[in-house]
Amino acid sequence: MKVKEVMVKEVATLDVNDELSLANDIMRLGRIRHLPVVDGTRLAGIISERDLFRSSLAQALGYGGQASRDLMKTLRIKDIMVQEVTTISPETNLCDAVRLMMDKKIGCLPVVENDRLVGLITETDVLLQYLKDCGADI
């Protein structure tokens, strides 16, 4: 089975110049843990809930609520995104993608074709496919 058969094709993305608070809002409201970051049409990085947590200096300093929100409005996505992103092709074998996620200890892989983001595959997508293959009602 190929990655293109399992990946999510409609992917929420962020621009490198978006405020960090936007990433927080999208992740919280959409229950999303990973967001690819684009610069035009080119994949520039990725940001995860873990990255947001690490960058929330206001929380680390004991501030909460509005102070944390104000800090997130001053930071840009490009300030905290992971720039060295492991990617795969839509034609990659699903087993190879799973092995790569396990080896790198990452929860998702952006799917790129001709330097353009075409999808995203996550641990959840793989588990859902497994359930389908087992004949489970989803």
Predicted stretch roles:
Residues 1-10, 49-85, 98-102, 122-138:
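Tandem CBS (Bateman) regulatory domains
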Residues 14-31, 37-38, 87-105, 112, ...:
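The conserved cystathionine-beta-synthase
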Residues 17, 46, 71-74, 91, ...:
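Non-catalytic, surface-exposed connector residues within folded enzymatic/regulatory domains
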Residues 19-23, 44-48, 62-68, 93-96:
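Short, functional N-terminal and low-complexity linear motifs
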Residues 27, 35-51, 101, 109-125:
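A glycine-centered beta-loop-beta connector
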Residues 34-35, 41-42, 63-66, 73-75, ...:
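Short, surface-exposed, polar/charged, turn-prone segments marking secondary-structure boundaries
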